[in-house]
């Protein structure tokens, strides 16, 4: 089985300077041959890959990839030469179901075995249509919470034998049970966007903060440093 499908086929092994809400044209977004934002291609035989999943936040939209928390984490761990493998879909309006489906795609690869999974969850009210590459909001909070609980159980089952951590940026503000927000693998639920840009994406201070948090959590849970 190959790596997950990108929704940015047109940029595979290429780049763009305008994407989603970033129409400034000042950042060069490099896409690898798998079609994901990164400065390296992916190898199914890589044993030290830290795989990152999420939304435009994990894709570091608005900033060079080298300022992303994913890149900083891989370069800030000294025990091994870790590589950051980004599987977030740029500025696509992905929902948590899409994010977990991507995690599942990686988990089901027979030859590729990530060292760590880092999962960024997004608003519980999002609904993504892969066929149309578009999304919308669902306004029923009860329905959103019920759907998310099922999705999270799936995530737990997928990664029960793996090294993994997660955090959430849920703009919907839905009250989520403590057994999720206080889960041992939860880094933080709704981290503050201590710097923002392009209307609603976090800036460099946020990425610095999250990289430190992720590194501390990896040390706490798995003695990875």
Predicted segment positions?
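N-terminal secretory targeting modules
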Residues: 1-51, 112-115, 121-142, 148, ...
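Surface-exposed cleft-lining segments at the edges of enzyme active sites
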Residues: 57-61, 88-92, 134-149, 196-202
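A structural motif corresponding to the C-terminal end of an alpha-helix
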Residues: 77, 150-167
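Serine-esterase "nucleophile elbow" of acetyl-processing enzymes
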Residues: 26-97, 209
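Soluble or luminal CAZymes and related metallo-dependent hydrolases
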Residues: 65, 94-101, 140-154, 202-210
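Active-site regions of enzymes building and remodeling cell-envelope glycoconjugates
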Residues: 162-165, 175-201
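Histidine-centered active-site loop/cap adjacent to the catalytic His
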Residues: 194-225
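Short, well-structured alpha-helical segments in soluble
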Residues: 100-112
